[in-house]
């Protein structure tokens, strides 16, 4: 294992959810221990090449699945990827289906989120620097299109768009909750994509989710209610498909043009530069230097 160095760079970050703890075909792998101003990420970062493309892989729950959704240090995870030069993040997540048409084993590429989390810090900007980023379209359309093409190429049953509802967990929903979420128009349900997507936007990273449907939550009248065992059974098949999808998508993801995601902070920071606490300004330098240049003489 090595510590992060100046040469440790990647353009694409992959955050692996339940069942996805590595990237198939990754070569020249280095295991990096990345320190951030926001603490330690969920695990070490695997940096390597996938068909010549530099990839940074981070296991969201840690290898061996040690960290529950409420305990994940989302800020450290996103900051760590940003510090390695990542500009585009692909999230791979196990989800429950909230629609009859989305069957276990299907792939969903959500384009909207509903945040029902309760215990999580959802911003980098607090304690003296305030920012309000636009989040009406939380998923990078260009990145999503590249993933859609790859899903078709590998023969996945894929659903374009949809609403991912993120609950706190770690318990699964009650039937009453599950039925309510269906009335709201939810497509899938999970526990991890928020605040992850919000923080990616604040870090000016393109973000998109590959959601792997494993079950029907607990709303379905004729299907078994969700259990860990049922999730793992379907997940083993889904992960094989997800690895093929990711590898197929890489060339197109690399070619994704610069978009508004990478300019999210342009007019978002409202705090006057001369009122920013110096220590906080230094802490957020990686995120805000592009839009709030450091004045000469300020350390």
Regions found by a protein language model. Give the residues of each.
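Zn-dependent metallopeptidase/amidohydrolase metal-coordination segment
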Residues: 191-229
């Amino acid at each position: 294992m090595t510590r992060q160095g100046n040469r440790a760079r990647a353009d694409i970050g992959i955050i692996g959810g339940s069942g996805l703890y590595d990237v198939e075909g990754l070569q020249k792998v280095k295991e990096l221990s990345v320190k951030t101003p926001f603490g330690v990420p969920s695990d070490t970062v695997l940096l390597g090449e996938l068909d010549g493309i530099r990839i940074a892989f981070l296991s969201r729950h840690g290898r061996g699945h040690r960290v529950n959704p409420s305990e994940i240090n989302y800020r450290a995870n996103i900051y760590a990827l940003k510090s390695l030069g990542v500009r585009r993040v692909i999230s791979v997540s196990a989800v429950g289906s909230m629609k009859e048409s989305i069957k276990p084993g299907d792939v969903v590429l959500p384009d909207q989120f509903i945040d029902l989390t309760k215990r999580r810090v959802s911003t980098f900007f607090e304690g003296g620097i305030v920012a309000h980023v636009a989040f009406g379209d939380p998923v990078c359309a260009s990145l999503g299109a590249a993933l859609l093409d790859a899903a078709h190429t590998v023969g996945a049953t894929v659903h374009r768009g949809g609403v991912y509802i993120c609950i706190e967990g770690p318990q699964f929903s009650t039937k009453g909750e599950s039925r309510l979420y269906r009335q709201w128009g939810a497509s899938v349900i999970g526990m991890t994509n928020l605040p992850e997507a919000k923080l990616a936007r604040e870090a000016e990273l393109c973000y998109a989710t590959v959601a792997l449907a494993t079950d029907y939550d607990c709303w379905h009248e004729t299907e078994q209610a969700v259990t860990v065992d049922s999730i793992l059974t379907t997940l083993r098949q889904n992960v094989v498909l997800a690895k093929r999808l990711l590898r197929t998508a890489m060339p197109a993801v690399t070619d994704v043009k610069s978009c508004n995601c990478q300019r999210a902070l342009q007019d978002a920071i409202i705090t006057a530069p001369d009122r920013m606490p110096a220590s906080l300004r230094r802490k957020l330098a990686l995120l805000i230097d592009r839009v709030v240049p450091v004045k000469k003489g300020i350390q």
